[in-house]
Amino acid sequence: MAKISKIEAQKRKGRYNIYLDGKYAFPVAESVLIQFRLMKGTELDEKQIAAIATADQQAKAYSRMLDYLSYQMRTESDIVKKLKEIDTPEEFVESILKKLRGQQLIDDHAYAASYVRTMINTDLKGPGVIRQHLRQKGIGENDIDDALTQFTPEVQAELAKKLAEKLFRRYRNQPERRREQKVQQGLMTKGFSSSVYEMIKDEVVPQPDLEQENDLLAKEAAKQWRRVRCYQGYEREQHFKQAMYRKGFDLDDVQSWLDAQDFQ
């Protein structure tokens, strides 16, 4: 048996050094000090010292998680990953999670709701992308579904309109059909369904600028016609039309351009 001869506070808050029989023995957290009722004069055997060391290891891991949580909200999955990163014994993980839950320091339902609320107020992402992010964070489907109820049809329409207007400006130098395709693709990439675009398109699709469209077509047509010069007659026209269609131009407009040319 060894006897505690001194308990000394470390510079780090909540940590103490334990001295046995006049010699430094080991450090402990304040919670461990209380848990084992350690005080000057307490006698400890090897089994008790081992139990104290195990408890302190768990206390340090818990303290690390408190630091980790101090910067932002975390999911249970985040905590588990972090505990593994710092080589926390597997048997400590569930008890640490239970303690954090009990103190309401982790709550996946609240995390999901907060994340969705933040995205609605600060970003132009749709529910599809947000659902995927929350899944990657280890959030359960029920918690995700509850959080996404904030994405009412009205909220989706408002965000989608802002994003669509931004995308239409970005692709303003594209042919009308290609521009609209790009906007639809952009909305879907950001997590909005095709039905949302159908709901808002009458409000966001710009009025056609015929002069600009004609200029774009004429410029691109001249370039593509040169590119297919290795073909002759009908075959050249077919390759030309295919190239123009891939670029987003209407085939009737392409034919009109062809009809207006004098290739003699």
UniProtKB/Swiss-Prot annotation:
Lineage, broadest ranks: Bacteria, Bacillati, Bacillota, Bacilli, Lactobacillales
Protein's UniProt keywords contain Coiled coil: no
Which source organism? Limosilactobacillus reuteri (strain DSM 20016)
Q: Keywords in UniProt for this one? A: Cytoplasm
Write out the annotated subcellular location: Cytoplasm
Q: What is its main location?
A: cytoplasm
Q: Name one GO biological process term.
A: regulation of DNA repair
- Any single Gene Ontology cellular-component annotation: cytoplasm
Q: Which Pfam families match?
A: RecX_HTH1, RecX_HTH2, RecX_HTH3
For this entry, the protein name equals Regulatory protein RecX
Function, as annotated, reads: Modulates RecA activity.
- Please name the InterPro entries in this protein's record: RecX_HTH_1st, RecX_HTH_2nd, RecX_HTH_3rd, Regulatory_RecX, WH-like_DNA-bd_sf
Family according to the record: Belongs to the RecX family.
